[in-house]
Amino acid sequence: MQAIILCGGLGTRLKSIIKDIPKPMAPINDKPFLEFIFEYLKKQGIKEVILAVSYKYEVIKEYFKDEFLGIKIKYSIEKEPLGTGGAIKETLKFVKNEAYVLNGDTFFDIDLSKLKLNESKICLALKQMNDFDRYGTVNVDEQDLVISFEEKVFKKQGLINGGIYLLTKDIFNDFALQEKFSFEEFLQENYKKLKARACIFDDYFIDIGVPEDYYHFLINN
């Protein structure tokens, strides 16, 4: 199975910490955050990774080259940032049938094999959260089909999009899309057509997009 990692983020909120490098290369003691994702994917049995890169991608390529930890690497290079949707769409030319998609700035320690498509074009990994206002929430029915998305408001309890997906190569085929678009917005607008389903996890999750969580991951690794 192949995995796509989205590495094009500018890391605006981490600028004071990581200076002038791509966000997934944020240093965690003696190695970049992205290396933790590679270690995780190796344990999950992934043999090939496609890195969707843009800003200062040379820094990533210099470190990981064309193979890392026995995982083959291909690079999908965006001359201009295409948004998460545009980046995924561009990488799908490297995908055979289906692929996992992960954010390069989040770590979600789930068992990837539990994500199942069945008749759907996409399966989302959702994280059970308590007392939060930083994320929007996702609602599912008893068949694990996505039935709605909610905006960011304080929630005592809810399910958030954990930033890992299993999707088909042809997920975008029936849609007229701009070159640059947000995958999250695409999902919110089209989850019914995609028959989007979800799998709920309670495993360790962290998003290093803000300094507080970056330092938390740094201290614990």
Swiss-Prot record:
It is an enzyme of class 2 (transferase). This enzyme is used in a preparative method to synthesize ample amount of GDP-D-glycero-alpha-D-manno-heptose to be used in elucidating biosynthetic pathways of various heptose components present in capsular polysaccharide (CPS) of C.jejuni. Keywords: Capsule biogenesis/degradation, Carbohydrate metabolism, GTP-binding, Nucleotide-binding, Nucleotidyltransferase, Transferase. It catalyses: D-glycero-alpha-D-manno-heptose 1-phosphate + GTP + H(+) = GDP-D-glycero-alpha-D-manno-heptose + diphosphate. One of its GO terms (molecular function) is GTP binding. Gene3D superfamilies: Spore Coat Polysaccharide Biosynthesis Protein SpsA, Chain A. Belongs to the D-alpha-D-heptose-1-P guanylyltransferase family. This is D-glycero-alpha-D-manno-heptose 1-phosphate guanylyltransferase. The gene is hddC.
